[in-house]
From Swiss-Prot:
Keywords: ATP-binding, CBS domain, Nucleotide-binding, Repeat. The lineage of its organism: Bacteria, Pseudomonadati, Pseudomonadota, Alphaproteobacteria, Rickettsiales. PROSITE patterns: CBS, SIS. The keyword Ligase does not apply. Belongs to the SIS family. GutQ/KpsF subfamily. This is Uncharacterized protein RP505.
């Protein structure tokens, strides 16, 4: 019989090893870390990432993260570099090389080219005495660690490299004041792009807004709500100030023999929640979930300018 409990034991061993390695990295930030940060903060060129094997995949991810936060970056395959793509590297670039051993032969031609062309190199390696470390301008020495896999498959070393790359990226964009608005420019697609969409760009506005006045009759209120098909209407004064909201539930609670005497102001919920047009879609969704509401008005300078339904947000992938 298969001992399935062993699966969890192995999983815990791997995760425990990863946790321990990250703690070691946190306590042993590379001595050149501040130097590379100061350099990159004033850097105007491109950051070229390179590495082979698993280090190459980590390099690709770091390059993608740099680019998405406003630092032009791309991945250069070492083999392609040796067959003509070295011409993609200019004197204004920084080449960041990833190699656990620092003796990856496929990187040597790139090292030689950069050294001969006065192109700066940042080395991410475990071996401070390696060829790569000795011939680099910035040494990002990562802690020596044992892989979680019993056969030595890159696991922990890959995680450490990725984490250090993410740390560099995060420090740079925070120090530069890179905002979520900036991030949206470089990442308009997917869930991230949807979450970072400003409400003003997706709200219902103009004639799409269900509006009634304080003295609008119960019957007319029902007609307007049915026409706009949002399950609610906003209540406004003559200056377009928001004073209340009426939902389908409010209507049901007020249906009785005296409905012909009812006006919007007598059945509305006063002081409803509202948001600014400048907030992000994700913030709006979180508020609506927290308050258990399906519609929320958008108000700027005390004036109603729009409304958003929770389904509008969910349908565009906001989460």
């Amino acid at each position: 019989m298969i001992n399935t409990n062993n699966y969890r034991i192995i999983a815990k061993r791997v995760i425990s090893s990863a946790t321990s390695a990250l703690e070691t990295l946190s306590n042993n930030i590379p001595s050149d870390f501040n130097r590379i940060i100061e350099f990159l903060l004033s850097f105007k060129g491109r950051i070229i990432l390179t590495g082979i094997g698993k280090s190459g995949y980590i390099a690709r991810k770091i390059a993608a993260s740099f680019s998405s936060t406003g630092m032009p970056s791309f991945y250069l395959h070492p083999a392609e570099a040796s067959h003509g793509d070295l011409g993609m590297i200019t004197r204004n670039d920084l080449v960041m090389m990833l190699s656990n051993s620092g003796e990856t032969k496929e990187l040597f031609n790139i090292i030689e080219y950069c050294n001969n062309s006065s192109i700066k190199i940042a080395a991410m390696t475990m071996n401070k005495n390696s060829t790569l470390a000795k011939r680099s301008d910035f040494l990002l020495k990562i802690p020596e660690c044992q892989e979680a896999s019993l056969i030595g498959t890159p696991t922990i070393s890959s995680l450490i490299m990725l984490s250090l790359g993410d740390a560099i990226m995060t420090v740079i964009h925070e120090e530069r004041g890179f905002t979520r608005d900036d991030f949206k420019i470089y990442h308009p697609g997917g869930t991230i792009g949807a979450n970072l969409t400003k409400i003003k760009n997706i709200m219902r506005s103009g004639d799409e807004i269900p509006l009634v006045y304080e003295d609008t009759s119960f019957t007319e209120t029902i007609i307007i709500m049915n026409k706009k098909r949002l399950g609610c209407t906003l209540v406004t004064d003559k200056e377009q100030n928001l004073i209340g909201i009426i939902t389908d539930g409010d209507l049901r609670r007020n249906i009785h023999d005296q409905i012909h005497l009812k006006t919007a102001s007598s059945i509305m919920t006063k002081n409803p929640h509202y948001i600014s047009s400048e907030i992000f879609a994700q913030e709006a969704l979180n508020l609506m979930k927290a308050k258990n509401i399906t519609n929320i008005p958008i108000v700027d300078d005390n004036i109603i300018i729009g409304i958003i339904h929770i389904h509008d947000l969910l349908s565009m992938g906001v989460s």
